[in-house]
């Protein structure tokens, strides 16, 4: 059991991380944080409106499409990371990944008369299997806690992120969506994905390891109901499918591999309560009945690694997430310039989730310099605490093998907590080109204190077509 169950659970957890928090810059159009009134603006919070693309109106084709209700956003994103010092493996390496993404919607209201009816879709092409975190920064004998390149997906692949139908009821206060969907269409979208490190990219709900972000689809249906212009209740039912990130599922309509269902619930508040400036807050919980393997306990009550019946499983697990994103200052001549602060927290069921809790906080400043009003400065830090059950299992495996030397390749490191920090400055070279150099600091990569702290230099490039 020791050799069959544990690696499989860790592989699934690592795969969930790799396919999770990667929300491309090209999706950050403010759609997910739309203003409850015309006065609420999320620009200073990191959600900028669409900018003119490199290809302009495409010889008049784009305006024709938009006149017929078809809107799209085509973008390119690349992320380069270099281990400047420290880490598990000190050999220098520059790791590069990139992706093309197409996000689109077709307005159906004019054709059908159904209020706010639309077809929405997302297609993502990812390239290269270059992962600096896996190859240099952390001990490969433990699970991932962060990624230096948040858009790393584990493979070069083109896949469907979502394809859904949506409409509204009750004078647009109730929105319904159904189809092959992704959580980023409805849930945990109060913090943008601008940092290059994974734990500082967006919220924490993907750390549940039971659903996936951005370019992985799964069947479901959701509802959003506006209690007031600023307060929204959200809920849904989705399939829990560990096979969803696989290559065979990239364009599949099948539910093959599904283990149960997910029940996400969230409340989101948009307000001007602080300094009469825009802010957005959320609190969410995610339940699933899909069986999850315990990280330590066996069916008979003792350690699962030596239990003849293997590790026990749980058919009811949960994940809690919350956060806020609040503008704190503004320039007298431009409300969209100023300082904003953010915070996010994810708390998992540590019986089955090796990421017990994770939290991030930081600041953004849009237009720090008068000569560069559209540039961004960002500084953030995140902490990940590993599950006690996971650590107990690692200790027990070492006891079974009689290995106590960390340098023995068969030793199982016992992780505690990891800390990652990032500083970036984003230069808006043109309306369609942004360059974002950054510096990352990794303390106890993957939570292993024996691994040397690491410094990473980074460069993110965003092109809008």
Describe each model-derived feature in a short phrase.
Residues 63-65, 78, 106-110, 166-169, ...:
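Residue-level signature of outer-membrane beta-barrel architecture
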Residues 2, 21-79, 109-113:
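N-terminal periplasmic/intermembrane-space "pro-region" immediately following the signal or transit peptide
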Residues 72-80, 119-125, 176-182, 233-239, ...:
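Transmembrane beta-barrel strands of outer-membrane/channel proteins
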Residues 453-465:
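Outer-membrane beta-barrel "beta-signal"
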Residues 266-268, 284-318, 329-330, 334, ...:
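Outer membrane beta-barrel transmembrane domains
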Residues 25-27, 55-72, 107-119, 170-173, ...:
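Short loop/turn motifs that connect adjacent beta-strands in outer-membrane beta-barrel proteins
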Residues 132-164, 172-265, 398-408:
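Surface-exposed coil loops of outer-membrane beta-barrel proteins
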Residues 82-98, 112-161, 255-257, 447:
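Surface-exposed loop and membrane-interface regions of Gram-negative outer-membrane beta-barrel proteins
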């Amino acid at each position: 059991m020791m050799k069959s169950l544990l690696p499989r659970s860790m592989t699934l957890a690592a795969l969930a991380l790799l396919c999770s928090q990667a929300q491309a810059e090209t999706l950050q159009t403010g759609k997910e944080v739309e203003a409850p009134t015309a006065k609420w603006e999320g620009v200073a919070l990191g959600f900028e409106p669409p900018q003119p693309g490199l290809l302009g109106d495409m010889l008049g084709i784009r305006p024709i499409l938009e006149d017929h209700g078809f809107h799209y956003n085509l973008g390119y994103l690349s992320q380069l990371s270099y281990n400047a010092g420290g880490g598990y493996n000190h050999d220098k390496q520059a790791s590069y990944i990139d992706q093309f993404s197409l996000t689109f919607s077709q307005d159906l209201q004019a054709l059908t008369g159904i209020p706010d009816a639309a077809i929405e879709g997302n297609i993502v092409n990812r390239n290269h299997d270059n992962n600096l975190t896996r190859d240099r920064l952390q001990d490969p004998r433990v699970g991932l806690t962060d990624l230096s390149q948040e858009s790393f997906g584990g493979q070069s692949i083109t896949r469907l992120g979502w394809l859904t139908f949506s409409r509204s009821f009750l004078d647009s206060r109730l929105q319904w969506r159904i189809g092959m969907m992704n959580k980023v269409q409805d849930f945990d979208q109060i913090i943008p994905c601008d940092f290059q490190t994974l734990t500082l990219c967006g919220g924490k709900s993907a750390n549940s390891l039971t659903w996936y972000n951005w370019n992985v689809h799964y069947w479901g249906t959701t509802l959003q109901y506006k209690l007031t212009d600023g307060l929204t209740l959200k809920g849904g039912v989705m399939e829990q499918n560990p096979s969803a990130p696989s290559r065979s599922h990239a364009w599949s309509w099948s539910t093959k591999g599904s283990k149960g269902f997910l029940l996400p619930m969230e409340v989101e508040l948009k307000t001007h309560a602080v300094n009469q400036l825009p802010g957005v807050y959320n609190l969410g919980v995610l339940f699933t009945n899909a069986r999850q393997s315990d990280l330590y306990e066996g069916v008979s009550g003792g350690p699962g690694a030596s239990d003849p019946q293997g590790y026990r499983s749980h058919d009811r697990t949960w994940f809690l997430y919350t956060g806020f994103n609040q503008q704190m200052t503004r320039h007298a001549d431009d409300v969209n310039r100023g300082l904003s602060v953010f915070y996010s927290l994810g708390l998992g069921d540590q019986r089955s989730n090796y990421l017990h809790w994770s939290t991030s906080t930081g600041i953004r400043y849009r237009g720090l310099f008068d000569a560069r009003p559209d540039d961004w400065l960002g500084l953030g830090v995140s902490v990940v605490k590993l599950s006690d059950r996971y650590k107990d299992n690692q200790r027990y495996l070492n006891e079974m093998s009689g290995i106590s030397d960390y340098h023995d390749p068969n030793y199982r490191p016992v992780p505690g907590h990891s800390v990652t920090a990032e500083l970036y400055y984003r230069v808006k070279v043109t309306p369609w080109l942004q360059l974002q150099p950054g510096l990352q600091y990794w303390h106890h990569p993957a939570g292993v204190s024996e691994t040397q702290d690491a410094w990473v230099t980074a460069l993110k490039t965003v092109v809008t077509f």
